[in-house]
């Protein structure tokens, strides 16, 4: 019996898929990494084969490739489907990504309640982004009953895993007394740790704190680091803080900004 052109193409694709699966099983870790960091379109073929075979990590990666249009045509709906499959397979990062799809309306109608469910599953599995994102929904009361104290607890859990953004928000809670008693010492500690992790908003916040404590030199250093991120909002915020500053280091930084230097320094 002869095959139609369509049947022949499907048979050839299936055979190629099977061959890729066999080769994947024989690859060393180094060979696999070289494959995944090579040509995106070629990598997508291998990732799809592993995803269709049922490997949650591959399903997650394929979802990301589809969401970003990396090596494949961008398809938010297909990305969400693969995130869901990986999440159902127990992958905490995929649970978080499925939550992001629900929260942002990527490939699926926006639904904060479903986002919270996925974030909670991810958070309870110990994923830092799941903890952070669940904290945000709890803080704002989106999809869940607002609970700022619970939000802070999740921020702290993510912070202890090294999540820079969570550290910054935990610091803000301690600074303002949101969901906890005010604690300048805790706020300073978490702003510092977040700033040292490289998060530019925390670098600005820590700089403000240091300026208020009278350490203009250290404040100027952190402001300069924050400015290096190139965020217009932070640049405007730094400029406002520097208005009327008398400390020599802060005055010099203000002059650098006025001269158009991106980080305020030479």
Task: Walk through the language-model features, giving the residues of each.
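Terminal, low-structured helical/coil segments at or just beyond the last alpha-helical repeat
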Residues: 5-6, 227-266
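Long, contiguous interaction/recruitment modules in multidomain scaffold/adaptor proteins
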Residues: 1-21
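Short helix-capping/linker turns of helical repeat alpha-solenoids
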Residues: 24, 39, 52-55, 68-70, ...
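Ankyrin-repeat and related helical/solenoid repeat scaffolds used for protein-protein interactions
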Residues: 161-237
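Hydrophobic face of amphipathic alpha-helices that form TPR/SEL1-like repeat modules
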Residues: 28-35, 61-68, 95, 99-104, ...
């Amino acid at each position: 019996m002869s095959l139609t052109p369509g049947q022949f193409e499907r048979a050839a694709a299936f055979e190629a898929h099977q061959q890729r699966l066999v080769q994947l099983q024989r690859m060393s870790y180094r060979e696999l990494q070289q494959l995944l960091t090579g040509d995106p379109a070629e990598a997508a073929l291998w990732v799809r084969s592993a995803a269709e075979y049922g490997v949650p990590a591959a399903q997650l990666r394929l979802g990301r490739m589809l969401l970003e249009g990396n090596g494949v045509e961008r398809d938010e709906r297909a990305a969400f489907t693969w995130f869901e499959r990986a999440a159902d397979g127990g992958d905490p990062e995929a649970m978080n990504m499925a939550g992001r799809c629900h929260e942002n309306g990527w490939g699926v109608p926006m639904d904060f309640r479903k986002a919270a469910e996925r974030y909670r599953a991810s958070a309870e599995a110990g994923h830092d982004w799941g903890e952070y994102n669940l904290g945000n929904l709890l803080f704002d009361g989106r999809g869940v009953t607002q609970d700022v104290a619970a939000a802070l607890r999740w921020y702290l859990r993510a912070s202890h895993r090294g999540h820079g953004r969570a550290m910054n928000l935990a610091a803000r809670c301690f600074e303002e007394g949101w969901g906890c008693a005010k604690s300048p010492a805790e706020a300073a500690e978490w702003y510092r740790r977040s700033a040292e992790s490289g998060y530019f908003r925390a670098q600005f916040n820590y700089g403000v704190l240091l300026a208020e404590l009278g350490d203009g030199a250290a404040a100027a250093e952190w402001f300069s680091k924050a400015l290096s991120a190139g965020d217009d909002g932070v640049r405007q915020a730094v400029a406002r803080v520097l208005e009327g500053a008398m400390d020599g280091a802060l005055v010099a930084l203000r002059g650098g900004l006025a001269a158009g230097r991106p980080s305020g320094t030479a």
